[in-house]
Amino acid sequence: MEYEKKYIHSSQLFVAVRPSVIQTVLGSCVAVCLYDSKMQISGMNHYLLPLWNNDGLASPKYGNIAISKLIEAMEAVGCQRRDMVAKLFGGASPNNFNAQNGMLVGEKNIQIAHHILSEQRIKIVASDLGGTRGRKISLESNSGRVMLKYVQKTEF
């Protein structure tokens, strides 16, 4: 099967209605992957910070916005919320990078994903979260399968 490849950056999301491989690289950011097995459609977001503070544009840079927008985008192509499942990745804290108010940004990003998905009654079926290493993930849209590789630190 021929797969279209789509790479998403921080603050982006993508829903694949044709067989695709959606990829991203994560550090403290989190990616939520949604899959509807009845429609065989998947989507992924990649957000940088947990919560929009109501200042400026409500961007998918923020977890609460990115997750809501991803759910809406899946519904816009015919998916039903009750048929969606989620897989979560990222939220690393390399060398305690990005500490804010005693809690690391990666940890806050993880918490907001759990909170919103629970609130929306979307079951989390797999996750690889936290730790100190980055991740590269690839989502096969028609199966919902995610391949993960850890990013190793290299010094020159």
Curated annotation (Swiss-Prot):
Q: Which domain of life is it from?
A: Bacteria
| Gene3D superfamilies, alphabetized | 3.30.1330.200
Q: What are the EC numbers?
A: 3.5.1.44
Instruction: Tell whether Hydrolase is among the UniProt keywords.
Output: yes
CDD domains xref list: CheD
Q: Does the keyword Hydrolase apply?
A: yes
GO BP of this protein: chemotaxis
Q: Which Pfam families match?
A: CheD (PF03975)
Catalytic activity field: L-glutaminyl-[protein] + H2O = L-glutamyl-[protein] + NH4(+)
Q: Name one GO molecular function term.
A: protein-glutamine glutaminase activity
Q: Which UniProt keywords apply?
A: Chemotaxis, Hydrolase
Tell me its family.
Belongs to the CheD family.
Record-linked HAMAP family: CheD (MF_01440)
The role this protein plays is:
Probably deamidates glutamine residues to glutamate on methyl-accepting chemotaxis receptors (MCPs), playing an important role in chemotaxis.
Instruction: Report what the protein is called.
Output: Probable chemoreceptor glutamine deamidase CheD
Write down the species. Answer: Sulfurimonas denitrificans (strain ATCC 33889 / DSM 1251)
Highest classification ranks of the organism: Bacteria, Pseudomonadati, Campylobacterota, Epsilonproteobacteria, Campylobacterales
